[in-house]
Amino acid sequence: MDILCEENTSLSSTTNSLMQLNDDTRLYSNDFNSGEANTSDAFNWTVDSENRTNLSCEGCLSPSCLSLLHLQEKNWSALLTAVVIILTIAGNILVIMAVSLEKKLQNATNYFLMSLAIADMLLGFLVMPVSMLTILYGYRWPLPSKLCAVWIYLDVLFSTASIMHLCAISLDRYVAIQNPIHHSRFNSRTKAFLKIIAVWTISVGISMPIPVFGLQDDSKVFKEGSCLLADDNFVLIGSFVSFFIPLTIMVITYFLTIKSLQKEATLCVSDLGTRAKLASFSFLPQSSLSSEKLFQRSIHREPGSYTGRRTMQSISNEQKACKVLGIVFSLFVVMWCPFFITNIMAVICKESCNEDVIGALLNVFVWIGYLSSAVNPLVYTLFNKTYRSAFSRYIQCQYKENKKPLQLILVNTIPALAYKSSQLQMGQKKNSKQDAKTTDNDCSMVALGKQHSEDASKDNSDGVNEKVSCV
């Protein structure tokens, strides 16, 4: 009897709740259709209906039900991530085009920057859209489970390639400052591409264990329905190998490069001052020197002064390049350090830290790291005139630089002037040779005249002697 009473009581309570729900729904629908309800009533009806929908889905914990709830909300974070994706893809495509088409930018450092732009562009194409999709689905993995390991692999690959490219650029600049002769001799386009291939090979080797183990065991890449690295050992080792060790090398070599440039600039300035003092004491009055000696002195003096000016110019160019690269390095460190530090904290203080807070921080910090891929083209635009002019032309669909009228005049007139000057020099040489021949002929004629006069005087003296003897 007690059981029957309890069942009747539960059935009656359920029936009453359903009747009350139907009455409330009918009341709200009638008020809404008749137009008698005001704005606040309509808003309350909407909120109440959403609450009832949430209550009806409380028992449904499947990913599809939760995904529908999150898709109904306005997600401004997804909109911001879409803007970051567009900027990343468009900006890095411009960098690739600039290095490929502009001859001024075709050197070893810019080849590294082009490869870095390729990594950032692929990150924007293959990784960021999937990450935005997980945001829309409440950080649940909406794709097939086998693609989770592949997505994490691409994410780690392109992020590792970015830091490895910056580390290689820093090492290459340091070697160029310390041993410029060896670097200029072996720093061809082929050598630069071989270094880039080595960077990509290292990046692939570091990130390859993710698909190898993740495809075999889903627990290493899934955690509570979210696609992320769940293996603590790989998180620790990967963070140090792919970020902190290259970061340390990059920072040390960058500061050593700056120190070497400052030292070379000081030595160059002191060397130029010493040469100027020696030159002021060694000059003689122009009247006491012949034109030939003056010409020889100018020939021997010009290369030294030109070399000094060229050395200062090269040091200045290196300092400007280091300034731009320093900004790129700093932005990369500032934007990626929070993610990797939080990633290590999630492993070290796993029991004491709040997992929900750590997870929310990682979701924010990873997009701050992605933002560095979109910032690099903006840095090149602000601090490099060649990149800036190339980007502006490419946006206007002008892929070749239009020569200015002055440049066209110089291109048309300089060869003619050079030809005329060469012809003038050849004419002067011919005239000098002809003058030398005429002087030689004159000298030979004078010598013949002198010999003829001597012979004539000799004949006259012989004739006089004969006459005297006859007498």
Swiss-Prot record:
Subunit structure: Interacts (via C-terminus) with MPDZ and PATJ. May interact (via C-terminus) with MPP3, PRDX6, DLG4, DLG1, CASK, APBA1 and MAGI2. Interacts with GRM2 and DRD2; this may affect signaling.
GO CC annotation terms, alphabetical: axon; caveola; cytoplasmic vesicle; dendrite; presynapse
Lineage of producing organism: Eukaryota, Metazoa, Chordata, Craniata, Vertebrata
Positions of short motif PDZ-binding: 469-471
Domain statement: The PDZ domain-binding motif is involved in the interaction with PATJ, CASK, APBA1, DLG1 and DLG4.
GO biological process: chemical synaptic transmission; G protein-coupled receptor signaling pathway, coupled to cyclic nucleotide second messenger; phospholipase C-activating serotonin receptor signaling pathway; release of sequestered calcium ion into cytosol; response to xenobiotic stimulus; serotonin receptor signaling pathway
Alphabetical keyword list: Behavior, Cell membrane, Cell projection, Cytoplasmic vesicle, Disulfide bond, G-protein coupled receptor, Glycoprotein, Membrane, Phosphoprotein, Receptor, Synapse, Transducer, Transmembrane, Transmembrane helix
Xref: PROSITE patterns: G_PROTEIN_RECEP_F1_1, G_PROTEIN_RECEP_F1_2
Superkingdom as given in the UniProt entry: Eukaryota
Chain positions with Phosphoserine modification: S280
Short name of one Pfam family: 7tm_1
Membrane protein topology class: Multi-pass membrane protein
Disulfide pairings: C148-C227, C349-C353
Entry annotated with the keyword RNA-binding: no
Positions with a binding annotation for serotonin: D155, N343
Extracellular topological domain residue ranges: 1-80, 138-146, 216-232, 349-356
Protein's name in the database: 5-hydroxytryptamine receptor 2A
Stretches assigned to the Cytoplasmic side: 98-111, 172-191, 259-322, 383-471
Family: Belongs to the G-protein coupled receptor 1 family.
InterPro entries: 5HT2A_rcpt (IPR000455), 5HT_rcpt (IPR002231), GPCR_Rhodpsn (IPR000276), GPCR_Rhodpsn_7TM (IPR017452)
Membrane-spanning intervals of the chain: 81-97, 112-137, 147-171, 192-215, 233-258, 323-348, 357-382
Intervals of motif DRY motif: 172-174
Free-text function comment from the UniProt entry: G-protein coupled receptor for 5-hydroxytryptamine (serotonin). Also functions as a receptor for various drugs and psychoactive substances, including mescaline, psilocybin, 1-(2,5-dimethoxy-4-iodophenyl)-2-aminopropane (DOI) and lysergic acid diethylamide (LSD). Ligand binding causes a conformation change that triggers signaling via guanine nucleotide-binding proteins (G proteins) and modulates the activity of downstream effectors.
Glycan-linked positions: N38
Organism: Pongo pygmaeus
Residues at the site labelled Hydrophobic barrier that decreases the speed of ligand binding and dissociation: L229
Cellular compartment(s): Cell membrane; Cell projection, Dendrite; Cell projection, Axon; Cytoplasmic vesicle
